[in-house]
Regions:
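Structural and coupling elements of P-loop NTPases
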Residues: 1-528
């Protein structure tokens, strides 16, 4: 296996509280990266999840930003070089969906975590749409089987209907809740018996489905039920073919309980076996193949203050082709400057280590002193622009005001860094010069206020503003655009890139503007 073939870069996505961070932790446990997983919910023991590293995440018990982690993994019984797994744990909370959408541009496949009692939820649907748009293959993990939940067949029907994708179970639960005995691994034809709270799966038994041994292991009634279920599964669902999964036509389904470490190792073993290695990336100019000799990469996320003692920013760069080498000069395409990085890093959430070289599929953290924006491209000299990192039109708006005039410098710096990170969008109203912050959800306003105060020592206050939609406007004819801006002066604003934004305060104002100015184009994402 060469370096590219052994890479697996994927995101774990789900509705809030389906157990995504727990699943990430268990992967890290099997990858030997952590000795004990922080039981995510348990407040008596203040262990917090490894991948939730911001203060606010530790306080609230939810993930609010994507974290990047990598580890080597070799399934039991296999020899040779281990797989290099890069996990991106995303926030499930819908207020941070924007961060998750962007993360999906940097992965080759995804694992969707579904709560066995609740089934498909709103956020799961939305994320699946993004995967479909990008043709990203998905594996579905039905979690929390050790609690009373719904019938597995009902869940599979719901997955097909709600997510509009064909499914194929590769493992099957034996009972659930109190009666949960374990999982039959269809992919490897083994029986895995469940013992709660063990660090590893206790027994794996290769049994013939029709033998007496099965009755002895799980009980006669359960054994008969399992035989009937598997017969039905084989009758209803077509046999699993790796290619249909990779082309995103079929989603393999696994059952288990991430909290009790059950079904996770089967998922990981099968995942590294069938998941695609890094795929070609689309740039405006051409397709970029991972096997090309020259380095290319793009920035899909910027995070301020991984270390609160230093006001540092880290830009996350996904390597698309070639080989990234420390201290090599690379072209920063948007600025047209040559940059070198003396201390690029790779992550295990907050613990980071300096990296000498990185290959396609890897995520590298680059120290950023304000030169990067989301979507920037790095190359060895070629003019390339990677597409597909949109900002969506925000849903909620508020005026932001500096609450302490003595701290205006800290306030401005904090606001700039948080906006570069893509936490929210900032518009400056041309009419009154006030700053309007637009977000996807209420929680982001709290995060901005909290982080300004705790990371930048600056206080802000929010004031209400009545706005319906923000849309980016452009026209082929400059005079028409100027005329539009003069006529709609009180509604015009600029975003952080200096582009013209029309802030409509009602649907009526927006539709009238669209009718009166036929030659002006109104965009609801910033990627056009």
């Amino acid at each position: 296996m060469n370096e590219i073939q052994r890479r697996r870069t994927f995101a774990i996505i789900s509705h809030p509280d389906a157990g995504k961070t727990t699943l990430t932790e268990k992967f890290l446990l099997f990858g030997g990266q952590i000795q004990v997983a922080g039981a995510v919910k348990n407040n008596k023991i203040r262990k917090t999840a490894t991948s939730d590293w911001m203060d606010i995440e530790k306080q609230r018990g939810i993930s609010v930003s994507t974290s990047v982690m990598e580890f080597d993994y070799l399934p039991d019984g296999e020899s040779g070089e281990p797989y290099k797994v890069n996990i991106l744990d995303t926030p499930g909370h819908q207020d941070f969906a924007e961060d998750t959408y962007r993360t999906l541009t940097a992965v080759d496949s995804a694992i969707i975590d579904v709560d066995g009692a609740k089934g498909v939820e709103a956020q799961t649907r939305k994320l699946m749409e993004v995967c479909r748009m990008r043709n990203t293959p998905v594996i579905i993990f039905i979690n929390k089987m050790d609690r009373e939940g719904r019938d597995p067949f009902d869940l599979l029907d719901e997955l097909e209907e709600e997510l509009q994708i064909k499914v194929r179970p590769l493992s099957w639960p034996i009972g659930q809740g109190q009666r949960f005995k374990g999982v039959y691994n269809i992919y490897e034809q083994q029986l895995n018996l469940f013992t709660p709270n063990k660090q590893r799966v206790t027994e794996k038994v290769a049994v013939d489905i029709n033998s007496k041994e099965l009755d002895e292991k799980v009980g006669e009634r359960e054994a008969q039920q399992l035989r009937d279920d598997l017969e039905l599964v084989d009758g209803v669902y077509p046999a699993f073919v790796k290619e249909t999964y990779r082309s995103a036509e079929v989603a393999p389904v696994f059952f288990g309980s991430a909290l009790n470490n059950f079904g996770v190792q089967e998922l990981l073993d099968c995942f590294v076996d069938i998941a695609p290695s890094p795929k070609p990336t689309k740039a405006e100019e051409r397709m970029v193949e991972p096997t090309e000799p020259k380095f290319t990469g793009f920035i899909f996320k910027i995070t301020a203050n991984i270390d609160p003692n230093h006001r540092s920013c880290i830009a996350f760069c996904k390597v698309c082709s070639g080989k990234f080498v420390r201290n090599q000069p690379y072209l920063h395409v948007r600025q047209g400057k040559t940059v070198r990085f003396s201390s690029p890093t790779q992550f295990m959430a907050q613990r980071k280590s300096t990296v000498e070289e990185a290959y396609p599929g890897d995520i590298v953290g680059l120290p950023d002193n304000g030169i990067f924006k989301i979507g920037d491209t790095l190359t060895e000299g070629e003019q390339l622009h990677f597409r597909g990192l949109p900002s969506f039109s925000p849903l909620l708006f508020k005026y932001i005001e500096n609450d302490d005039p003595m701290k205006s410098k800290q306030f401005q710096k904090g606001l700039d860094q948080l906006m570069d990170e893509g936490v929210a969008q900032l518009f400056v109203n041309q009419f009154n010069g006030r700053k309007v912050v637009g977000t996807v959800g209420q929680l982001q306003f709290e995060v901005i206020q909290y982080r300004l105060e705790h990371e930048y020592n600056a206080k802000c206050r929010w004031e209400p503003v009545h706005l319906y939609k923000a849309c980016w406007v452009e026209a082929d004819d400059v005079t028409e655009l100027d005329n539009f801006k003069k006529r709609k002066y009180q509604y015009m604003a600029k975003d952080t890139e200096g582009r013209d934004v029309f802030l409509a305060d009602s649907s009526y104002v927006l539709s009238m503007a669209q009718q009166d100015f036929k030659n002006i184009r109104f965009h609801f994402t910033s990627e056009f």
